[in-house]
């Protein structure tokens, strides 16, 4: 999908890999080596300590009063989760990457994401995500990057699977 002129960019639906790694020195290097050996290129990556996700769950439990587990269980999970990181990967060949990582005994999950290539100038991401708000589509998380002198930036956005078709149609109407 080519975005309208003022949004200056394109969007495509891709597949993201999520991998749980032990949070220890050298583990990310091992993951990268596994992918390199299969000639799989990492295009974008986000790393988050799993403890943050568990903290969010615990905080939501406190706010809503909905108790899925006992407080002691959450504290135990929180303690254990600091030993792990959640790695989100955009790669050039996701199906092959998934097989390769599973073969190397990694826990892997796949899910659809939206990848935006935008002109690297102030306000471009804001113009695009404004369309999500107008379409009443919540963005769960974003990661991306560009260097100051790069012509393009890349951003990975995750939305609920139920919202993918709606936002694709909304953006397609803009081209």
Report residues per predicted region:
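A conserved regulatory-domain signal marking ACT and ACT-like small-molecule sensing domains
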Residues: 3, 7-175
């Amino acid at each position: 999908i080519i975005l309208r002129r003022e949004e200056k960019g394109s969007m495509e639906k891709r597949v993201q890999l999520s991998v749980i790694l032990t949070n220890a020195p050298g583990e990310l290097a091992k993951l990268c080596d596994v992918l390199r050996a299969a000639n799989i290129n990492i295009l974008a990556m986000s790393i988050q300590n799993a403890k943050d996700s568990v903290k969010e769950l615990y905080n939501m439990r406190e706010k809503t009063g909905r108790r899925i587990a006992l407080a002691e269980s959450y504290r135990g999970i929180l303690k254990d989760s600091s030993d792990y990181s959640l790695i989100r990967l955009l790669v050039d060949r996701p199906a092959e990457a998934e097989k390769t990582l599973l073969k190397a005994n990694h826990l892997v999950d796949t899910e659809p994401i939206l990848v935006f290539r935008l002109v690297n100038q102030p306000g471009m991401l804001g113009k695009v995500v404004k369309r999500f708000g107008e379409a009443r589509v919540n963005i769960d998380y974003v990661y991306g990057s560009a260097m100051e002198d790069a012509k393009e930036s890349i951003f990975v956005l995750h939305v609920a699977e139920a919202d993918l078709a709606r936002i694709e149609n909304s953006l397609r109407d803009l081209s």
